[in-house]
């Protein structure tokens, strides 16, 4: 019941966002998007900590390198200094491309979480669904933003996800689940950073305060 109530509240928030955002300024839209991306990154960090609490001893050794994340092919700024040199149109394009690239992986994680061999799989499953909700909400908000910014900001890079199976044994499932979550956490941090830079520019804050 609590889950349904929470989902209803978020759904109403999304509806309010879609209906009202067309009538408000770009800086306010940036602020709302930044708040949602911050929540997205916070949730992914919490999930990673949950997974760390019950991780196989050899997990760190066996887990694929970050360069194996399916979004690694997308060229993005490596730090804030580089991000500050990137145009608004490119930053919003990168954020939307990363967000879209996680639709299918989040579906996979959502389907695997309830039976994950982890004592907190119920909480993990609930948080994954929250990630999906916030990702959808943020994506809807960014769509409205680019409509205000113009055609040059609407380009999205297509990033295919070829994974569809976490493995058959318990260790493989835990490691691959954790790997995907670590990739998402990395990308959610990028999305959050890009949107915060955009927010700073929209509100004409000094770059060093972004």
UniProtKB/Swiss-Prot annotation:
Print the keywords alphabetically.
Disulfide bond, Hormone, Secreted, Signal
InterPro entries for the chain: 4_helix_cytokine-like_core (IPR009079), Somatotropin/Prolactin (IPR001400), Somatotropin_CS (IPR018116)
Signal sequence, renumbered to the chain: 1-23
Q: Which PROSITE patterns match?
A: SOMATOTROPIN_1, SOMATOTROPIN_2
Q: Which is one GO molecular function term here?
A: prolactin receptor binding
**What Gene3D superfamilies does this protein map onto?**
1.20.1250.10
Q: Give the SUPFAM superfamilies listed for this entry.
A: 4-helical cytokines (SSF47266)
Keyword Nucleus listed: no
Cellular component terms per the entry's GO annotation: extracellular space
**Its Gene Ontology biological processes?**
cell surface receptor signaling pathway via JAK-STAT; negative regulation of gene expression; positive regulation of gene expression; positive regulation of leukocyte proliferation; positive regulation of lysozyme activity; positive regulation of phagocytosis; positive regulation of protein localization to nucleus; positive regulation of reactive oxygen species biosynthetic process
The name under which this protein is listed is Prolactin
């Amino acid at each position: 019941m609590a889950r349904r109530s929470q989902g209803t509240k978020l759904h109403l928030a999304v509806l309010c966002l879609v209906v009202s955002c067309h009538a408000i300024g770009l800086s306010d839209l940036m602020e709302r998007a930044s708040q949602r991306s911050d929540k997205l990154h916070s949730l992914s960090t919490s999930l990673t900590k949950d997974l760390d609490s019950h991780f196989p001893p050899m997990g760190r050794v066996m887990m694929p390198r970050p360069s194996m994340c399916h979004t690694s092919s997308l060229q993005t700024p490596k730090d804030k200094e580089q991000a500050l040199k990137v145009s608004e149109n490119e930053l919003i394009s990168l954020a939307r491309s990363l967000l879209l690239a996680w639709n299918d992986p989040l579906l996979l994680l959502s389907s695997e979480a309830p039976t994950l061999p982890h004592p907190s799989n119920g909480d993990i499953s609930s948080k994954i669904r929250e990630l999906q909700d916030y990702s959808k909400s943020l994506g809807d908000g960014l769509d409205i933003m680019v409509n205000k910014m113009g055609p040059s900001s609407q380009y999205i890079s297509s990033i295919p996800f070829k994974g569809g199976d976490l493995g058959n044994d318990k260790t493989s499932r835990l490691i691959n689940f954790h790997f995907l979550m670590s990739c998402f956490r990395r990308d959610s941090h990028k999305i959050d950073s890009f949107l915060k830079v955009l927010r700073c520019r929209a509100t004409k804050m000094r770059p060093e305060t972004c």
